[in-house]
Amino acid sequence: MNAIIVTGGDIDISLLENYIAENKEDVIISVDAAITKLEKINVIPNIMVGDFDTLSDGEKLKKYENLNVEIVKHDPIKDFSDSELAVDRAVKDDIKNIAVFGALGKRFDHAFANILILQKYKKIGVDITIYDKYNKIYVKSNHFILEREKLWGKYISFFSLEGKNFMEKLEGVKYPIENKIIYNIATPSLYISNEIKDDKLEAKFSGDLLVVESRD
């Protein structure tokens, strides 16, 4: 079982609508005021999570309760973001694959925390992918293959999440890598804006890397 989490950041509505249409069996979790985004495309979530401090209309919660939507309400004073609590709710149902929309909004603190959440859950076997109009962001461990026709846009970039990672090989790309260290401090931008030139890329490396597929 997979899940789609919709948070309160910037969302390309048509992108979200198309993704939901293509993944009709996925559990849909709305975070706080993101329900207003789902209402624009006439989608009723399975679960609503949050402190609902940004949802001023109390009648809206009652409406969805009457539609048998599970409401998970948290205290506004808490140690976790609403987005992280939504992921926890999905994991509670043993969901291992989660797509997140709206994670990259106006506030960088929330966006950065959402990116760090990817690695936290990767460590327990949960794959989370953040989508927006221009980016697809996820964490990979040790090895992966990506076909060029499945690339989100034109570019692919890699960032260390562990201070440094050893890249044994990155092949099938415009700028191949062999037996090099990826440092997140000394060379933070060295491995950005690569391109797949063959039918697929293959990467072998140590630990976890943040992978960003992007387009202009």
Feature locations, PLM:
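Class I SAM-dependent methyltransferase SAM-binding "motif I" and its flanking Rossmann-like core
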Residues: 120-148
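Short phosphate-binding loop-to-helix
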Residues: 71-93
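N-terminal beta-strand-loop-alpha-helix module at the start
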Residues: 1-64
